[in-house]
Amino acid sequence: MAAAGLVAVAAAAEYSGTVASGGNLPGVHCGPSSGAGPGFGPGSWSRSLDRALEEAAVTGVLSLSGRKLREFPRGAANHDLTDTTRADLSRNRLSEIPIEACHFVSLENLNLYQNCIRYIPEAILNLQALTFLNISRNQLSTLPVHLCNLPLKVLIASNNKLVSLPEEIGHLRHLMELDVSCNEIQTIPSQIGNLEALRDLNVRRNHLVHLPEELAELPLIRLDFSCNKITTIPVCYRNLRHLQTITLDNNPLQSPPAQICIKGKVHIFKYLNIQACKIAPDLPDYDRRPLGFGSCHEELYSSRPYGALDSGFNSVDSGDKRWSGNEPTDEFSDLPLRVAEITKEQRLRRESQYQENRGSLVVTNGGVEHDLDQIDYIDSCTAEEEEAEVRQPKGPDPDSLSSQFMAYIEQRRISHEGSPVKPVAIREFQKTEDMRRYLHQNRVPAEPSSLLSLSASHNQLSHTDLELHQRREQLVERTRREAQLAALQYEEEKIRTKQIQRDAVLDFVKQKASQSPQKQHPLLDGVDGECPFPSRRSQHTDDSALCMSLSGLNQVGCAATLPHSSAFTPLKSDDRPNALLSSPATETVHHSPAYSFPAAIQRNQPQRPESFLFRAGVRAETNKGHASPLPPSAAPTTDSTDSITGQNSRQREEELELIDQLRKHIEYRLKVSLPCDLGAALTDGVVLCHLANHVRPRSVPSIHVPSPAVPKLTMAKCRRNVENFLEACRKIGVPQEQLCLPLHILEEKGLSQVAVTVQALLELAPPKQQQHQLSAV
C-alpha cells in the first residue's frame, strides 16, 4: 500500500513538471480549460488562433495583434473570411502584406503597425473598399504607385524610411488624413494640391527645406511641419482659412521671424497678410489668383462664412445667420435693373418726342448753346444712346456748325481725352439727318397715278442721294480740319499768352522791388492801386495763371510783399492796375480768337486772393525765406534773396562734407564699408557703440545686436544702444554742447550733429591712433 502511494505521488509530480515545462503527456490535452498550468504552449497558441479566426468569420473583425507572426496563419483557409471588414495585424514580424489579406474584398480597415514590411504587393488593389491603412513603424523606403489607386481616407506611414512621396499621391481624392512623419522626405510633390479633401497633414521630423505653395488651396485643419529645415512660410498660406492648429517648432524660420512664430497662429497669419499687402504687385500668378476678395483690407476683415469648420482667423461672427451670406445684397442686385429701367424710360421719352415733332419740323437756329448741350450729350452717353439721339430732329441748315463751335468741340476733345468726341458719330449723325430731311421734304402721297413715276425716278433719286452724301462728307471733313487747325492755333496762342503774362509780371515785380526803398507800404497805397498780382479776369484760366504768377514771384524773391489775410481786401472790378491794363498780356487775351471766354464773365469775375494757391504761395515763401511772417513793410530785395539762397547752399555743402567725413571716420576705424544710406545704417546704434568701444574699450558694456532670426532690432533696443553710445561719449569727455540728441540718430534727421559728436569723440582717442587716422583721411 505504501509503495502504491509513493508511485502515485511520483506520477503526479512528473505530470505537473511536464505541464510546467510546456510538454504534453500521451493522451492528455493541455490547455487553458484543463486547469493545469497557464496555457502558453503551442497548443494554446494554435487554439487561440483558431478562436480568433472563428470570431472573424462570425463578426467580420480579425484581430491577430501581438502574436509574433512571420506569415499569415495557415488555418485561415479553413474559415470563410471574405466578409472581413477590419483586420489588425499589428505588432508582428510580417515582412510583407500577406496575400491572403489582399483577398478580403470587403476590408475597410487594415492595421499593419510595427511589422517588418519592406514591400507592398500589387494585389492590394483588390481592396477597393479600403479606407484606413496604417503601415507605420515598418521598413518601407517608397510608397508604391498602386497604393495611390485605393479609396483611402486615412493613410498613416510614419516611422519608415521614406525618401519621397510619389507624384501619383494626387490621385487619392478622398484622403482626409496623411501622416508621413519621422521619415527622410526631402520634398513634397506639387500634386499634393489635388487632395481636395485633406484635413490633417503631418510631415513632422523629415528633411524638408521648403513647403509647397499648393497646400494653400487645401481645406487643412491641422498642419504639422515641425522638426524640419524650413526657413520661410509662403505668403499664400494666409489663405488657409480653416486651419485650427499649426505646429512649426524646431525650424530655422526667418519669415515670419521667430519672435512672431512663438506668439501663435494669429500673429503668424497677420504677418503673412501684411507681407501680402506689401508685395502684392510683385507676387507670382499663383499667389494672385482670384479669391473673392477685393483687397488686403477685406481679407483682414472678412465676413465670409466658411461652414462649421472655421479657424477663427479672418472671420467675424456678425450674428448674420442668413443662407444668402455669399449672395449680393438687395441694393446692389437691384441696381442694374433700375439703371435699365431709367435707360428704357429715356429712350421711350425721346421716341415720343420724335413722333410729336415729326408732323411739324422745328428749325433750330443752330446756336452755340443748343450745340453745347448736344455735344455734352454725345460725350457722356453710350453708343446706344447716341443712336437714339440720332432720331431727334435737327435744323436743315448744315452750315450752322460754325468754325468757332467746331473749334470749341475740338478743344474739348484735346483737353478731355478721357471722353473724346467721336467724329465718326458726328458724321453719321449728319448723314442720317440729311437723308431723313431730304426724304421728308420730297415725300408725296402714294397714289395709284404716281406709282409709275415713282419707279421711274428711283434711279435719279439714288444718284442724287449719293452726290448729296459725298458733298456732305466733304463739308464735314473740311470743317473738322478747320477745327483742328483752330485748336492748334488756340493752344499756341494760349502758351504765348502765358509767357507774355509771366514776363509782364516779372518786369512789374522787378520795377516794384527797385522802388521798394522809396515806398513804405506799396500794397496799401490806394492812389496807384498797384499790386504785384494781376487781376484774375485778365487770365484764361482761374488757377493756372495765378500759380504761374506765384512761381514768377518765387524766382524773384518778393514773398514779403504778400499781406496777411486779415489785412488784405479784394480789389473791385474797377481797381485794376493801370500798368497791367496796358500790358501786352491783357491785350493779347482780349484780342485772342473768337473762342475765348465771354466778356461778361471777364468783367464779373472777381479777384480771390484767399484761394488755396494764394495761401500755398505765401506759406512756401514764408518757410523758405524766414522763420516767421514778415510785415508788409519789410520787403526784401533781389540781392537779399540771392544772399539767403547762397547761404543755404553753402550750409548744405558744409553738411554734406561733415557727413562724408563721418562715413570716412567710421569706415577707417571699424574697417567696414557702410551702405549708401548712412542714416539707416546708424539708426540702431550698433555701429556707433562699436566705435565708442574702439576709442575706449568697454566704454559700452552691452550692445544689442540683431540675429539671423530677428534681423531688425526693436525701437526700444535701438534707443538703448543710442543712449549707451551718448553716455559713453559723455564719460570719455565729449563736451555737452557737442553731443547730439538721440532723435538725431533714431530719426536720421541730424547726421551733421552726429558727425560733430563723432569728430569730438575721435579727437579724444589715443594720440597714435588719432595721428594715423588723420593722415589716412
Curated annotation (Swiss-Prot):
Pfam families: CH, LRR_8. It comes from the Eukaryota. One of its GO terms (biological process) is septin cytoskeleton organization. One of its GO terms (cellular component) is cytosol. The modification Phosphoserine is found at S324, S415, S419, S611, S628. The keyword Magnesium does not apply. Residues 568-590, 621-653 are annotated as: Disordered. Its main location: cytoplasm. Residues 382-648 are annotated as: Mediates direct interaction with MYO6. LRR repeats lie at residues 56-79, 81-104, 105-127, 128-150, 152-172, 173-195, 196-218, 220-239, 240-264, 266-290. Residues 635-645 have a biased composition (Low complexity). Residues 652-765 form the Calponin-homology (CH) domain. Keywords: Cytoplasm, Leucine-rich repeat, Phosphoprotein, Repeat. InterPro entries: CH_dom, CH_dom_sf, Leu-rich_rpt, Leu-rich_rpt_typical-subtyp, LRR_dom_sf, LRR_domain-containing. It is found in: Cytoplasm. Residues 56-290 are annotated as: Mediates interaction with DOCK7. The keyword Oxidoreductase does not apply. Component of the DOCK7-induced septin displacement/DISP complex, at least composed of DOCK7, LRCH3 and MYO6. As part of the DISP complex, may regulate the association of septins with actin and thereby regulate the actin cytoskeleton. This is DISP complex protein LRCH3.
